[in-house]
């Protein structure tokens, strides 16, 4: 999760709480969403400092993206990972493609 505190963007890990178990697997509570946006990002993607356009979950389907928070911490978000961006004001974060590979992702706005 990317969030903003005292003017800086930081990472924070969050765990999903499983509230129901069925024969087909575990389920979390329902989270609010206002739609989905499909995105294809070229392998040359290198986007300098920017805030997120809205609070949203990003579900990485393939490829990877390196995210740098404004506090300097870097993380690589790989295939199958979900992250929540909430740094909608201020310097934001820096993001770039990993390994020159195209990436497909889904944005799930929550506002």
Where are these regions (language model features)?
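Short, conserved beta-strand element in jelly-roll/cupin
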Residues: 40-42, 50-67, 109
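A short glycine-rich, His/Asp/Glu-containing loop-to-beta-strand
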Residues: 5-49, 103, 111
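Short beta-strand segments in beta-sandwich/barrel cores
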Residues: 36, 46-47, 64-68, 82
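Short, Lys/Arg- and Gly-enriched loop/turn segments at beta-strand edges
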Residues: 22, 91-97
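Short histidine-centered beta-strand/loop micro-motifs
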Residues: 26-30, 46-52, 68-69, 75-76, ...
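Short acidic-glycine-tyrosine-enriched beta hairpin
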Residues: 40, 70-88
């Amino acid at each position: 999760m990317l969030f903003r505190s005292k003017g800086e963007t930081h990472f924070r890990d969050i765990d999903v709480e499983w509230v129901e178990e069925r024969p087909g697997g575990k389920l979390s509570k329902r989270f609010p969403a206002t739609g989905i946006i499909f995105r294809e990002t070229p392998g040359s993607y290198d986007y300098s400092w920017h805030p997120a356009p809205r609070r949203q979950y990003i579900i990485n389907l393939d490829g990877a993206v390196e995210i740098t928070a404004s506090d300097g911490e870097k993380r690589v978000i790989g295939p199958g990972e979900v992250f929540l961006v909430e740094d909608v004001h201020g310097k934001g974060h820096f993001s770039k493609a990993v390994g020159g590979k195209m990436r497909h992702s889904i944005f799930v706005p929550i506002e």
